[in-house]
């Protein structure tokens, strides 16, 4: 059994598979790519009142190794899933490892706009997950950027926590459904700013101001806020299996109902690479557990290891 991905989905799979005696190999990458690695305080993971994202990942890595997983800090560069055993190409020397079962848990990446100040203030007032980092916005003036259903949903969610929410759209109309648009328009704590884009994020140790450019007039207006959330979409990291397993139009791996099975026997998916709805660490970990149990049973029935 090979697991590709070093986030909570892949690591939970490694823990369960290790405890089942499968001696799984898990590829964590040269640098662990879990979004938790760029998260400061995690306050919604059961068992921890608060924990730093990298510390949570390291705890899971240590537990996976303790349970018998073999850790490879290398990138997987190619997967040949056309026939069993599957071929996994990895590392600088393009070595090939074969396996009878594969759990793919490479996650997704939140899209950002790479404006001035974004990197400097990432997790210091700037985030791409309102549910994960809502405490950044507590009793603060907050910005949400985006015009789709997710942006409207997150603006509505944050309106219960922030003192005020500015919803910034590049266009003069929403892409969201009529019901979601009505929800934000009728919310007295949400102010909608049309035809605009964030030009720069400013602050000292944390965000305290952004510059907003009107895309029609070109005027730039300062806006005093202390939190900003990008809600402009996610990109699933599934290119290694593109054309080999069934995916959605947006590139998310499709799994069979109530399981982590893909349409290819012996290949399972877990975490955000197959979840475009919840995108939470605890959900990813749960799906990693399911994937390991599915893989264990599948291997037992198909004579693999």
Swiss-Prot record:
Cofactor note (record): Binds 1 FAD per subunit.
Oligomer status and interactors: Homodimer.
Cofactor: FAD
Species this protein is from: Spironucleus barkhanus
Keywords from the named record: Cytoplasm, Disulfide bond, FAD, Flavoprotein, NADP, Oxidoreductase, Redox-active center
Chief location: cytoplasm
EC number(s) on file: 1.8.1.9
Taxonomic superkingdom: Eukaryota
Protein family: Belongs to the class-II pyridine nucleotide-disulfide oxidoreductase family.
Protein name: Thioredoxin reductase
Note: The active site is a redox-active disulfide bond.
Disulphide-bonded residues: 129-132
UniProt-listed PANTHER family: THIOREDOXIN REDUCTASE 1-RELATED-RELATED (PTHR48105)
Pfam family, one: Pyr_redox_2
Locations listed in the record: Cytoplasm
GO function term, MF aspect, one: thioredoxin-disulfide reductase (NADPH) activity
Reactions the enzyme catalyzes: [thioredoxin]-dithiol + NADP(+) = [thioredoxin]-disulfide + NADPH + H(+)
GO cellular component: cytoplasm
A single GO BP: removal of superoxide radicals
Annotated binding of FAD, by residue: 28-35, 272-281
EC main group: oxidoreductase
InterPro entries the record matches: FAD/NAD-bd_sf (IPR036188), FAD/NAD-binding_dom (IPR023753), Ferredoxin-NADP_redctase_2 (IPR050097), Pyr_nucl-diS_OxRdtase_2_AS (IPR008255), Thioredox_Rdtase (IPR005982)
């Amino acid at each position: 059994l090979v697991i590709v991905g070093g986030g909570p989905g892949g690591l939970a799979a490694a823990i369960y598979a290790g405890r089942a005696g499968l001696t799984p190999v898990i590829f964590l990458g040269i640098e662990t790519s879990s979004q938790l690695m760029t998260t400061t305080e995690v306050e919604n993971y059961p068992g921890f009142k608060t924990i730093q994202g990298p510390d949570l990942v390291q705890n899971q890595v240590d537990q996976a190794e303790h349970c018998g997983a073999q850790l490879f800090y290398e990138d997987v560069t190619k997967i040949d899933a056309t026939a069993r055993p599957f071929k996994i190409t990895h590392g600088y020397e393009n070595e090939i490892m074969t396996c009878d079962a594969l759990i793919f848990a490479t996650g997704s990446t939140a899209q950002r706009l790479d404006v001035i100040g974004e990197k400097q203030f990432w997790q210091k007032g700037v985030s791409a997950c309102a549910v994960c980092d809502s405490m950044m916005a507590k009793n603060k003036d907050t910005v949400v950027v985006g015009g789709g259903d997710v942006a409207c949903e997150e603006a509505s969610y944050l309106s219960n926590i922030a003192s005020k929410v500015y919803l910034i759209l590049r266009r003069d109309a929403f892409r969201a459904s009529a019901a979601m648009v009505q929800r934000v328009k009728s919310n007295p704590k949400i102010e909608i700013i049309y035809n605009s884009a964030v030009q720069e994020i400013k602050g000292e140790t944390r965000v305290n101001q952004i510059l907003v450019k009107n895309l029609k007039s070109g005027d730039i207006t300062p806006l005093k806020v202390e939190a900003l959330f990008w809600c402009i979409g996610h990109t699933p990291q599934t290119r290694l299996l593109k054309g080999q397993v069934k995916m959605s139009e947006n590139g998310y791996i499709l799994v069979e109902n109530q399981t982590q099975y893909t349409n290819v026997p012996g290949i399972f998916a877990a975490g955000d690479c197959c979840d475009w709805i919840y995108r939470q660490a605890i959900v990813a970990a749960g799906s990693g557990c399911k994937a390991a149990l599915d893989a264990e049973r599948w291997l037992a029935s198909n004579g693999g290891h």
